[in-house]
Amino acid sequence: MSLLKMEYNLYTELKKMTCGQSLSLFNEDGDFVEVEPGSSFKFLIPKGFYSSPSVKTSLVFETLTTTDNKITSINPTNAPKLYPIQCKVVSEVVSNMRKMIELKRPLYITLHLACGFGKTITTCYLMAIHGRKTVICVPNKMLIHQWKTQVEAVGLEHKISIDGVSILLKELKTQSPDVLIVVSRHLTNDAFCKYINKHYDLFILDESHTYNLMNNTAVTRFLAYYPPMMCYFLTATPRPSNRIYCNSIINIAKLSDLKKTIYVVDSFFEPYSTDNIRHMIKRLDGASNKYHIYTEKLLSVDEPRNQLILNTLVEEFKSGTINRILVITKLREHMVLFYKRLLNLFGPEVVFIGDAQNRRTPDMVKSIKELNRFIFVSTLFYSGTGLDIPSLDSLFICSAVINNMQIEQLLGRVCRETALLDRRVYVFPNTSIKEIKYMIGNFVQRIISLSVDKLGFKQESYRKHQESDPTSACTTSSREERVLNRIFNSQNR
């Protein structure tokens, strides 16, 4: 730990990384406070900040030669086989770490790699190279299985802890596994933090973007007060301010053969309203809608739009155009609505729900990976980041209010490299609730723009359903309605 006075140059360097947000650190009294320019207090500067050689410092940091937390059970023949692009990442990491050791810099690296790159297998390869006892920290239980599979493939002795940190600490008195796989809430326990700081050299923070380290969280406190000897942050969408805790970044572009298309399912709706909708509309401009809660609630009860989503999905699934579908909503009640309706159509052998309130959901996710055809309905919170179903070929985004980081993570669920190359995303920019039509159009346009401009998707209009089903709510049977549709869409965007 390094307690330093906040001099001008240090403050400027740290503040630059927050991209205009407030800069918060632990002060000498242990309080997590916002740092003001010219402050006379001393602050705890994160170890990982000094991993970049561009940061000037006279501090000298320990290297691995001073510890003895080595893995003794490594068999080099068990190291996973990597693609050439993954080997390039490994080469970059090894080269950077040699320089860090030479310069006495902390061995902290952020692996900023695209969704579907194979961050888990690449990091397991690095873990085998380092040969150091490792803690893998994940934000939720759902991500544990993919790490377990890769760690077992490398042949390392490991322990998974999901039943509570107190039970784990008791077990660690009689055993010392080479790899610990834990959920991040374990870091709220100081005794556990002290233990891994002493007995484990490598700390891997998976999905690091899910943690805002400018907040006083368990991960923030751990990295500040119990900094590991080596650390990897893994993410496809890094938070700029998190660089303060891990200031060396490796980012290698990934070329893909995937054919990625985002289908814009336009429709012209007659205005739709109910007593419930009218009641929620009154709350749109109030403080209760600060995070667009009521905007999403209105979408969840927009019956014509919901029916359009269902009609599109059913037609595409029945035709065999898509086979392994992820349906994403923002709200749980919206998820349950789609699940029940799809369950009535296709049955429990095909339709599954990714419910955060069901403890069996992670086991269910494992079971559907081998299915040739399925529909998985879940929420953005549960399945928007880290969902490990590589075979997904299509995504239906029923929500609208999603930030850029969430959009990129969500689209990454259908960008995993497999033998099948076609990937389809369906978005629905229209609503029958006139009070939110422009807002929804703008939010969905942001999804479209990011997918095309940054992630390499091709945009196409989806017309099949409207032309083939004259009885649906989204029928455009006349030339006049098609003209109105085009006018409406141009206004929406």
From Swiss-Prot:
Gene Ontology CC entries for this record: virion component
Protein EC: 3.6.4.-
Gene3D superfamilies linked to this entry: P-loop containing nucleotide triphosphate hydrolases (3.40.50.300)
Taxonomy, superkingdom: Viruses
Enzyme class: hydrolase
InterPro entries: Helicase/UvrB_N (IPR006935), Helicase_ATP-bd (IPR014001), Helicase_Restrict-Modif_Enz (IPR050742), P-loop_NTPase (IPR027417)
Keywords of this entry: ATP-binding, DNA-binding, Helicase, Hydrolase, Late protein, Nucleotide-binding, Transcription, Virion
GO molecular function, one term: hydrolase activity
Compartments (UniProt record): Virion
Domain Helicase ATP-binding, chain residue ranges per copy: 100-256
Motif DESH box, chain ranges: 206-209
Entries under Pfam families matching the protein: ResIII
Chain residues that bind ATP: 113-120
Self-association and partners: Interacts with G2. Might be part of a transcription complex composed at least of G2, A18, and H5.
PANTHER family membership: ATP-DEPENDENT HELICASE IRC3-RELATED, TYPE I RESTRICTION ENZYME ECOKI R PROTEIN
Family classification: Belongs to the helicase family. Poxviruses subfamily.
Role of this protein: DNA helicase which seems to act as a postreplicative transcription termination factor. Involved in ATP-dependent release of nascent RNA. Forms a stable complex with single-stranded DNA, and to a lesser extent RNA.
Record-given protein name: Transcript termination protein A18
